[in-house]
Amino acid sequence: MATPTQTPTKAPEEPDPFYYDYNTVQTVGMTLATILFLLGILIVISKKVKCRKADSRSESPTCKSCKSELPSSAPGGGGV
């Protein structure tokens, strides 16, 4: 029985390019989704507020496009 004179050396392993830290990926994804969700709500709210301010001051082209969305500006005295 022969014994090896040298200990076998391991070849240097390259890191797997398809290894993902799924916890970090999930955290970043949820953070981005939350930011985009809140940004979308902020944009929708800001357009409604902008339209109401413009409607109370004077007739403007931007508000004319919003008039159909606002219940208080319905023809015939609308309102609630």
Swiss-Prot record:
**Gene Ontology cellular component annotations, sorted alphabetically:** plasma membrane
Which residues does the entry place in the Cytoplasmic compartment?
Answer: 47-80
Question: What membrane topology term does the record carry?
Answer: Single-pass type I membrane protein
GO MF terms here are: ATPase binding; sodium channel regulator activity
Gene3D superfamilies on file = Single helix bin
Phosphoserine: modified positions: S73
Per the UniProt entry, what are the Gene Ontology biological process annotations, in alphabetical order? positive regulation of sodium ion export across plasma membrane; potassium ion transport; sodium ion transport
Extracellular face residues = 1-23
Cysteine pairings via disulfide bonds = none
**What are the UniProt keywords, alphabetically?**
Cell membrane, Glycoprotein, Ion transport, Membrane, Phosphoprotein, Potassium, Potassium transport, Sodium, Sodium transport, Sodium/potassium transport, Transmembrane, Transmembrane helix, Transport
* UniProt PTM: O-glycosylated; required for stabilization and translocation to the plasma membrane.
Q: Which InterPro entries match?
A: FXYD7, FXYD_motif, Ion-transport_regulator_FXYD
Q: Which residues cross the membrane?
A: 24-46
Query: Which residues does the record list as glycosylated?
Result: T3, T5, T9
Under Pfam families, the record lists: ATP1G1_PLM_MAT8
According to its UniProt record, where is this protein located?
Answer: Cell membrane
Report residue spans for region: Disordered. 54-80
Q: Which domain of life is it from?
A: Eukaryota
User: Which CDD domains does the UniProt record give?
Assistant: FXYD7
What does this protein's UniProt record list under function? Answer: Associates with and regulates the activity of the sodium/potassium-transporting ATPase (NKA) which catalyzes the hydrolysis of ATP coupled with the exchange of Na(+) and K(+) ions across the plasma membrane. Reduces the apparent affinity for external K(+), an effect that depends on the presence of external Na(+) and voltage. Increases the apparent affinity for intracellular Na(+).
Q: How does it assemble?
A: Regulatory subunit of the sodium/potassium-transporting ATPase which is composed of a catalytic alpha subunit, a non-catalytic beta subunit and a FXYD regulatory unit that modulates the enzymatic activity in a tissue- and isoform-specific way by changing affinities of the Na+/K+-ATPase toward Na(+), K(+) or ATP.
Give the protein family. Belongs to the FXYD family.
Domain notes, please?
The transmembrane domain is important for the interaction with NKA and with the functional effect of FXYD7.
Question: Which PANTHER family did the record assign?
Answer: FXYD DOMAIN-CONTAINING ION TRANSPORT REGULATOR 7, SODIUM/POTASSIUM-TRANSPORTING ATPASE SUBUNIT GAMMA
Kindly provide the name given to this protein in its UniProt entry: FXYD domain-containing ion transport regulator 7
Origin species: Homo sapiens
The organism that produces this protein has a lineage beginning with: Eukaryota, Metazoa, Chordata, Craniata, Vertebrata
